[in-house]
Amino acid sequence: MDQTSSSTQILVSLMENAQPDPTAGQPVAQVILDNFCLSSMYSPDVLRNPRAQHTIKTAVFQWIDEHHRKMYDCPIEPPLRFTDDAHLSADRCWHHLIGKLERVVSVLRAMRAMSRFEHNVFVFLPYCKRLRALVELFRHDYCCQSTVAGCARALDETIADAQRHLLVVRSMSERAAVMLVFSDWVRVYQCNICEDSSAEEQFLKPNVCCGYRVCNACYAKLWEFCTGAYPVCPICKTGFKSSSSNKRLQKADDPATL
C-alpha cells in the first residue's frame, strides 16, 4: 500500500469515528467558551506580550505537526513549519512543496473534523494564512493546477470559518470588558499630571512619597525641566534624588528644590 492510500484511509477513519456533537442547540458563544482548548496557557499579559502569543501559536503548530507524523510518518518539513522564514528564494525550484502543502492541508481537514478542534478552528488561523500565502505562489504554475486550487479552496474555507468564530469571540470580549468595569480585578493606572492611563503597573513611577501618581514620561520631564539639583513631588515637595546605582528618596531640605 502506498503512502497516499494509507493516509487517505487514516483520514476516512478519523471522519467515520467522529462522535455526535453534544453541543447541538447550544448558543455558539457558550459552546466556544466551554470547549476552548488553550485555556491553560492564560497569562495576565497575554494580549500585550508577543513572546507569550508566539508560544501559544507554536503550541498549536506542534499539534498539527504531531498529527502530520501520525498520518504520514514524518514531520512537516521546512519551509512549511510555523517558525520557518516564509520567504522562498527565487533562485531555486520549489515545485516539490505542492505535494507537501497538500498533505498539510489534509491534516488540517482531518483535525477540523475532530471534536477537540471543531469549535476551536480559529486557533489554526495564523498557520492557515501562512500556508495560503505559500499556495498563492504556485497559483499560475503550468502543472498541478487542480491540486493547488484544491489546497487554496480548503484553506479559504478554514480561514473563513475561523474568522466567523473570532467574530463571536470578539463580541464576548467586548461584553466581558464592560462587565469587568464593576469588578476590582481590572486595575487602571492613571497619571495625575498628564491623565494618560494604562493597564500596566510599570506605566507609573513607583510610589515613594505621598501617593501622587506620576507616569514615567512625566517623571522624565520633571528631571528635564527641574531648576534645582533634582525634581520634587508636585504635591508634598519630596525630592527625587538619583544616584548611579539606584533611585532613592530624599526629603528636600535644600530651599532651591522647593
From Swiss-Prot:
Pfam families reported for this sequence: Baculo_IE-1
Keywords, alphabetical: Early protein, Metal-binding, Zinc, Zinc-finger
Zinc finger residue extent: RING-type: 191-237
Lineage: superkingdom: Viruses
TM annotation in the entry: none
Xref: InterPro entries: Baculo_IE-1, Znf_RING
GO molecular-function terms, A-Z: zinc ion binding
Name this polypeptide is given: Immediate-early protein IE-0
